[in-house]
Amino acid sequence: MTEYVAGKYDVIVIGAGHAGCEAALASARLGAKTLILTISWDNVALMPCNPAIGGPAKGHLVREIDALGGQMGLTIDKTCIQIRLLNTGKGPAVHALRAQADKKRYQREMIRVLEHQENLDVRQAMVESVVVEQGRVRGIRTNTGAFFAAPALVITTGTYLRGRIIIGDLHYPGGPNGYFPSVALAASLRDIGVRLGRFKTGTPARVDGRTVDFSQMVEQPGDREPLNFSFLSPRIERKQISCWLTYTTEETHQIIRDNLHRSPLYAGVIEGTGPRYCPSIEDKVVRFADKKSHQVFIEPEGEGTHEMYVQGMSTSLPEDVQVTMLRSIIGMKDVKIIRPGYAIEYDYVDPTQLRLSLEHQEIGGLFTAGQINGTSGYEEAAAQGLMAGINAARFVKGEEPLVLKRSDAYIGVLIDDLVTKGTNEPYRMLTSRAEYRLLLRQDNADQRLTEIGRSIGLVDDRRYRRFREKMQLLEQEVVRWKSSFVTPGNKKIQAILDEKKSAPLTKGVSLYDLLRRPELTYDDLIPLCNDGEKDLPIDPEVAEQVEISAKFEGYLVKQQAQVDRFNKLENKRLPADLDYKRVHGLSNEGRQKLIARKPVSIGQASRISGVSPADISILLVYLEQQRRLAPGEGGVD
């Protein structure tokens, strides 16, 4: 086939899923001439699994993407059909937004944003090879002979790399939702020295909502006063569509047990490792044999369709078994399948080959983001895509990469876990993975990250102005509460305390200090603030942050002290050219891991599996010796 030069760019993004969209938009918005390529322009921002954005830890990621100037939060706010705040019975660290998406509208809106973005070209093409010369990216080739030149490349191919669809005895090469897999590109990555592994994920059947008996299920409506993912979005006032909760039965489980011999998962057909936190229904029935039922959520796929997603029933069982199994669920005895569930195997890049910037350690200008890095979930993908797009643009400009620490954001935790620790199964973001989760709440993502987004040029004037206005309101509100006092003789406060079964006052106290009591809320006390100035236009999120800062002040101070100690180790930098073979006393395993991972700091080195506390002590002594031998050169503060 005749090759021709089809174009020259600063950054090329391969794949237009959730990672690719964020990467391309970030790169273009930072001024880099960018091209995004996808197998099909119809699969842009596709949701091949659940029709939802957010949830525990994932909602935090979406808020952080938005605070930095990313797109996902804005798009889901415009296209959601339901939104709920989860975990409200727990502390604020784990409060999380989750939205049901109209999948097609979400795609159309993201396509509109991409097509109208300055500095961004879009192209439908099958990329077959990555061109690397002298250890640096030079461009890519497509199956039609087009060569696109660029010094930076972001690969966001999701589950398409050598994808294989599996439904019972049927298995064939394919990507999600019937799209083509990317086979030649996987071979090209191996040829240039990228280490690949094999993972598996799956999805449940989609069913016709007209054949579901919702009267036998429990309705799950959206919040009456829904919050937004984006700090820029107006309040959501559109009509919401409910989800429905039902359960499997003992009959369901018996059907599955009777057909385990036909399950690819248990017949040895599936080679890839599956996700721990999203197991198939057959896996759940085997692992939790004592459970008589499992929750099943019926979720609408959009406003103008009868297609419903059966959350909790991911499977690769044969289609005839899927039909029988689904019809044994409460309220689904007459259900009809629109699309069967399936498993998909795919290649992924071992993320320990990457720097914290998501650039490959050995191939300059090669970035990867999303499920190709071993993660699961749209939100994890989008977060990586944003950071890879930012750093690809900065790479082209010769600027230092943007790296968020574990104490900065869930995004920092996500990337540090992948690069430093690696993963042997599809990685899912969890609040429990974040050591400093009380500081990394979803409500304060803008306070943590918008200034960073502004400093690199991704946060525009409108967003920054809105952020500064909110910060000013918050400061004023805290001052107002700290300067408003009540005394034991105040009948209004006594009535409130009696109603809330709170201890009476014994001395004068500010309303801010009174708000520390767990049984009292902002809304309870606002009528007393400055003689009842309750009509001030206070943003509900500002009110929430005032309450959190009062109630959790002691814990926040303690956690900040932990962060300060953490940052001391993070700030002890390890030279990029450090020869660990010359550092005497390191354990053999520790030396091997340090050579392979190339940590940038003592803090990162301490999180590598196989590097012991003794190894860290030896590194600290070595760095101090080097500092004394060469004062002012490569020293450690």
Swiss-Prot record:
One of its GO terms (biological process) is tRNA wobble uridine modification. NAD(+) binds at residues 274-288. GO terms for cellular component: cytosol. The keyword Flavoprotein applies. It holds the Pfam family GIDA_C_1st. It comes from the Bacteria. SUPFAM superfamilies: FAD/NAD(P)-binding domain. Keywords: Cytoplasm, FAD, Flavoprotein, NAD, tRNA processing. NAD-binding protein involved in the addition of a carboxymethylaminomethyl (cmnm) group at the wobble position (U34) of certain tRNAs, forming tRNA-cmnm(5)s(2)U34. This is tRNA uridine 5-carboxymethylaminomethyl modification enzyme MnmG. It comes from Heliobacterium modesticaldum (strain ATCC 51547 / Ice1). The gene is mnmG.
